[in-house]
Regions:
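N-terminal leader/targeting segments and the immediate start of mature chains
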Residues: 30-80
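Generic short beta-strand segments
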Residues: 75-82, 110, 184-192
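An acidic-aromatic
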Residues: 93-148
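Extended beta-strand-rich segments in extracellular/periplasmic secretory proteins, especially
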Residues: 159-211
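Flexible, membrane-facing loop/turn or short amphipathic-helix motifs
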Residues: 80-85, 115-118, 190-200, 230-231
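Sec-dependent N-terminal signal peptides of Gram-positive bacterial secreted proteins and lipoproteins
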Residues: 2-4, 12-40
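Acidic, serine/threonine-rich low-complexity disordered tracts
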Residues: 201-247
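Flexible, processing/modification-adjacent segments and terminal tails
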Residues: 125-177
Length: 247
């Protein structure tokens, strides 16, 4: 009797495993089919997501961003530099305040150490964008160290879907879990050369973003680097409506 009961339990377990296996296969097929239908993660799908980058690139007068993003925005920049055998990050963060129509923030020079990893702020200053003057430091004596350029790259760099389609794609990626996507191009561009002090060099040019069916706020980061190194990044983020309502 015990052997018969054990045999029945064994058959039942096998049957359950078969059912689970069948369900798993069906789910995988459904997900694969769904991805094929939607094209999520494909080159054309990602390029469609980043096509609204022309909303910012170019914006010759940063104050025009208040018309594009009425509830405000934040601009981030990061630039990696080498000085006297040491590595520094120049980090700029400025907020577009919709109430006073000013773009203000801070810029810092941060020493990066690897063993152990450590960040030390060595220089910093408040900074403001002023029309016809560009980026202006509260501490002007630090301009050479903190502001390699007194304007944003998006003021000069023109990007749109037609331009991007002509570029060589190096790689692309999409996460179904987070909705984040990126596409990396190879590019030689005069405005990038001028901004980063390059000489007609081909560099990698990443565009990162995040897909959401609900949240359609503007969110793109561009990352420029030589080989695998990240030399510069710039991000413009539209303020979210929910945050505005909470305030």
């Amino acid at each position: 009797m015990k052997e018969e009961k054990s045999e029945k339990e064994s058959k039942l377990k096998k049957r359950i495993l078969q059912i689970i296996g069948t369900i798993t296969v069906v789910c995988v097929l459904m997900i694969t089919a769904g991805c094929g239908i939607m094209g999520m993660g494909s080159k054309s799908w990602i390029e469609k997501q980043v096509s609204d980058i022309e909303k910012v690139y170019p914006t010759e007068n940063p104050e025009d961003l208040f018309e594009k993003f009425p509830i405000g925005f934040t601009i981030y920049q990061s630039r990696i530099i080498e000085e006297n055998g040491k590595t520094y990050s120049i980090r700029l963060e400025m907020k577009g305040n919709k109430d006073i129509k000013k773009i203000e923030g801070e810029v810092k020079k941060v020493l990066l150490e690897s063993k152990p990893y450590k960040e030390t702020i060595v220089k910093e200053s408040k900074v403001e964008y002023i029309k016809d003057k560009g980026l202006v430091l509260e501490n002007p004596e630090l301009v050479n160290e903190l502001l390699p350029k007194n304007y944003f790259l998006f003021q000069k760099l023109k990007l749109n879907k037609d331009i991007l389609k002509k570029l060589e794609v190096k790689e692309k990626g999409f996460s179904f879990e987070t909705g984040r996507y990126n596409i990396k191009y190879l590019i030689t561009n005069e405005e990038i050369d001028n901004y980063l002090g390059l000489n007609k060099e081909k560099v990698s040019f990443d565009i990162n973003g995040e897909y959401s069916e609900i949240d359609k706020t503007y969110f793109h980061t561009i990352i420029i680097g030589k080989n695998t190194e990240i030399d510069f990044s710039e991000k413009v983020v539209e303020e979210e409506i929910d945050k505005e309502n909470e305030e």
